[in-house]
Amino acid sequence: PDLCLSDEFQAEPKQLSVNFKEVDHVEKAIAEADVILVEPVVQPDYTKSRDERTGELSLTPANYKITREVLEKKAKSDAILLHSLPRMDEVPVDVDITRWSRYWQEAFNGVVMRMTLLALVLGAME
């Protein structure tokens, strides 16, 4: 599938004077990034168990995967890597223990934030 941004999608940031560029490989953009936000390129079918969708496990094109090697060769030492989770194959598990990984903290902070918002909405706190 064509993974380029459509003209329609590019129009809005251009109208807002957002400075962006489109590249065909993460290695071309990662060296400049302070924050690397990764999302699945192809959305898996979550109605099936992981065992049932074994054929889907290699859905991310290699040029869009954030591997440990790419991070070690290209990323800034103080950059952070975020992911909304759950992940498929776009970020291999060996990236979890690198200095860039912040997605587990991101997930924890999201739980705390949702708990706080629920408590506020339900009147348990002011």
Explain the meaning of each model-derived region:
Residues P1-E39, P44:
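Glycine-rich phosphate/diphosphate-binding loop of Rossmann-like nucleotide-binding domains
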Residues R68-D78:
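Short, conserved loop/helix-junction motifs that constitute active-site signature segments
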Residues D78-E126:
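Adenosine-phosphate binding glycine-rich loop
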